[in-house]
């Protein structure tokens, strides 16, 4: 999300132009040669990407990040939530097309498409329903909340698997979900661990990368159960604090998000 402003173009130009998207990402790689960008050449449309597949209206502006408007305010509507077709619905085909159209030039620059990327089920659910409505439903209507999250989880698995099928160079998944940082211990164990375990196991990817830069202490204690071996956490937590909670297994790599 920082690339358009850094490169000196509007958000709309960045998201709508393959040429400007590629040039700005190549420039970032050239300007910071010692940095590994993960995922690198991220083709996405802000918070619109996954919710758009469910039919959420999308809002784009010149100076702010795209966002999706909610479509399900009542948890009783959980059973009617559609299962998107990831090859055709919303902005998802545009993500795949952008990467396909530019993959040769990306490789010519010495880079590769390595990650399948998706927002996580709680993040997507918060855009479909509203954050407050989602959190209240988790507390007062667990049966329907499980159904709602499970439907979204199935979609996330489909979406990650489709990306991996389209680009054989992919051997990592990145899932971004700050909403799990708002869950208490009991809610995290009941709702988050099972769905994230399913998501991180669904593609067989070697690198299983989770981003949560809200409160991450409960998350850090649960990384192994979730199937995570790389964790991007809030700059409000120290590396030592997260490492102590995550454990010392050599396959678990953790690093903090930069402050804003």
Q: PLM ranges: what are they?
A:
Residues 32-36, 75, 156, 178-179:
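Bulky hydrophobic/aromatic packing residues
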Residues 1-60, 147, 193, 197-198, ...:
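N-terminal basic, low-complexity leaders that serve as flexible interaction/assembly modules and, when applicable
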Residues 44-84:
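A contiguous, low-structure linker/loop signature
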Residues 21-25, 67, 77, 91-98, ...:
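Generic hydrophobic, aliphatic-rich segments that mediate packing or membrane embedding
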Residues 1-14, 82-260:
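Active-site loop segments of alpha/beta catalytic cores
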């Amino acid at each position: 999300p920082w690339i358009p402003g850094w490169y000196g173009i509007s958000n709309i130009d960045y998201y709508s132009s393959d040429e400007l998207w590629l040039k700005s990402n190549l420039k970032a790689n050239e300007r910071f040669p010692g940095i590994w960008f993960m995922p690198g050449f991220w083709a996405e449309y802000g918070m619109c990407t996954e919710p758009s597949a469910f039919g959420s209206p999308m809002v784009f502006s010149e100076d702010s990040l795209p966002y999706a408007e909610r479509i399900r305010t009542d948890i009783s509507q959980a059973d009617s939530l559609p299962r998107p077709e990831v090859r055709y619905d919303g902005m998802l085909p545009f993500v795949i097309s952008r990467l396909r159209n530019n993959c040769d030039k990306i490789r010519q620059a010495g880079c590769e498409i390595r990650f399948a990327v998706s927002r996580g089920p709680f993040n997507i659910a918060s855009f479909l329903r509203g954050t407050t409505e989602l959190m209240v439903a988790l507390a007062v209507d667990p049966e329907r909340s499980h159904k709602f999250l499970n439907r979204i989880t199935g979609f996330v698995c489909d979406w990650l698997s489709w990306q991996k099928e389209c680009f054989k160079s992919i051997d990592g998944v990145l899932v971004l979900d700050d909403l799990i940082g708002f869950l208490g211990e009991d809610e995290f164990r009941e709702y988050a661990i099972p769905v994230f375990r399913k998501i991180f196991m669904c593609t067989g990817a070697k690198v299983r990368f989770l981003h949560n830069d809200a409160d991450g202490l409960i998350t850090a204690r649960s990384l192994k159960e979730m199937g995570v071996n790389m964790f991007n956490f809030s700059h409000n937590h120290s590396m030592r604090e997260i490492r102590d909670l995550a454990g010392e297994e050599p396959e678990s790599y953790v690093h903090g998000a930069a402050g804003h």
